[in-house]
């Protein structure tokens, strides 16, 4: 489960689980609540989003019906495509914990390091306003 900001492409949160139902959607939405309330949430037609999004009062739920809609979920699908290409090189994960760790590192790279052509070659964190010196970027990379 992922939540991505549509303007900055910053991955706000992820939740790895063995199941993909409404309780997991509740979990990821609760995890990102401290970051603020969005005006809208865009999702595909998967049923598990319905009830969790209804609990976010005042938030519009836009369920993408087709690729020809005015509003699409292309941003998250693009992220998923990049993630799957990276994941295939790993030949699976050795454990649930290692999967969480590796996904966290991928998201760190995606948010803070990887330039995005649609964001004038800035990583999402910089597009969102984070300003880091080159030294601080290197320090964060070493920690990750």
Model regions and ranges:
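Short small-residue beta-strand/loop micro-motif enriched in glycine and branched aliphatics
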Residues: 9-14, 89-91
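Acidic/histidine-rich, metal-coordinating catalytic segments
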Residues: 37-50, 120-125
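Short hydrophobic/aromatic-enriched beta-strand-loop microsegments
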Residues: 57-67
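Short, aromatic/basic amphipathic alpha-helical patches
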Residues: 50-57
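C-terminal domain-tail junction helix/linker
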Residues: 89-144
